[in-house]
Amino acid sequence: DEIDDILNGDGNVERTGQTDPNEVPETPEVPVSTPGEIYQLGDHLLLCGDSTKPVDVKKLIGLGEADCWLTDPPYNVAYQGSNGLTIKNDSMEDTKFREFLRSAFGLAEKALKPGASFYIFHADSEGYNFRGACHDVGLRVRECLVWKKNALVLGRQDYQWIHEPCLYGWKDGEAHNWYGDRAQTTVMEFNKPKKNDVHPTMKP
């Protein structure tokens, strides 16, 4: 039901698939995605791939086709979830991390239409590298949004984090599209998921 809600939007439009809804493929013996594998979810494509590799990005989208880019890349904070899950590329030397971000952001910039918006979740401790990588590839940050969670994340720092910053802007070249109203603020209050069972830092 949750996936149907995502694919059908507000539920006012019922979309039908190309096969019988009860015709579900058999679960493979080892249900693990492999690099290069693409899944189609309604009109959407999901790739098991690497957003720093042009060949992977081209499998999903061409130049100047994307209306929006929302990303939650590694924060470079060596995070490990309570269940032991870790994130690849989350503990890199400073200049290597900047280059890693620059590679991914550069490909995203090429995929965006002029005027297309972007949202980049990040760790404030790496704010210089995230903002710098945006600057390096010609993406201008217009605002920094804050996702305020309903509960803190217990950590090792003096102040416990209850928010995550998110860089917001759009690609130059055309006026950007805005789909909200004038009542939106830079603070977005959403409950964090009750458990991070499929990814160490799940978003709502």
Model-inferred region functions:
Residues 1-204:
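Core catalytic lobe of class I
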